UniProtKB/Swiss-Prot annotation:
Full protein name: Protein PB1-F2
Functional summary from the UniProt entry: Plays an important role in promoting lung pathology in both primary viral infection and secondary bacterial infection. Promotes alteration of mitochondrial morphology, dissipation of mitochondrial membrane potential, and cell death. Alternatively, inhibits the production of interferon in the infected cell at the level of host mitochondrial antiviral signaling MAVS. Its level of expression differs greatly depending on which cell type is infected, in a manner that is independent of the levels of expression of other viral proteins. Monocytic cells are more affected than epithelial cells.
Misc. comment: Is not encoded in all strains, and seems to be dispensable for replication.
Assembly and interaction partners: Oligomer. Interacts with human SLC25A6/ANT3 and VDAC1. Interacts with host MAVS.
Species the sequence originates in: Influenza A virus (strain A/Turkey/Ontario/6118/1968 H8N4)
Subcellular location per the Swiss-Prot or TrEMBL entry: Host mitochondrion inner membrane; Host nucleus; Host cytoplasm, Host cytosol
Keywords assigned by UniProt, alphabetized: Apoptosis, Host cytoplasm, Host membrane, Host mitochondrion, Host mitochondrion inner membrane, Host nucleus, Host-virus interaction, Inhibition of host innate immune response by virus, Inhibition of host MAVS by virus, Inhibition of host RLR pathway by virus, Membrane, Modulation of host cell apoptosis by virus, Viral immunoevasion
């Protein structure tokens, strides 16, 4: 699951497919479907942390697909502010 978190927007394009490992852990995989089907197929027993992670991943994917001018400005300012503390170099 760790490798899948590197590119969350790619994961968020489908419905959830749950697989059980030998040790009893559940593995979540996403397959291609639209957002309504994604929400409909979420298991009712999924814990809140996993559901929150899926929601955040889906929002990141939507942002990359169709960013608004306001969200772009916010994103740029967040990235620029920490680096602006160092000042400009010639």
């Amino acid at each position: 699951m760790e490798q899948e978190q590197d590119t969350p927007w790619i994961q968020s394009t489908g419905h959830i497919n749950i697989q059980k490992r030998e040790n009893g852990q559940q593995t979540l995989k996403l397959e291609h479907h639209n957002s309504i089907q994604l929400m409909d197929r979420c298991p009712k027993t999924m814990n809140r942390a996993v559901m929150l992670k899926q929601t955040v991943c889906w929002r990141q994917w939507l942002f990359l697909r169709s960013p608004t001018p306001v969200s772009l400005k916010t994103r740029v300012l967040r990235r620029w502010k920490p680096s602006s503390k160092h000042g400009w170099t010639n």
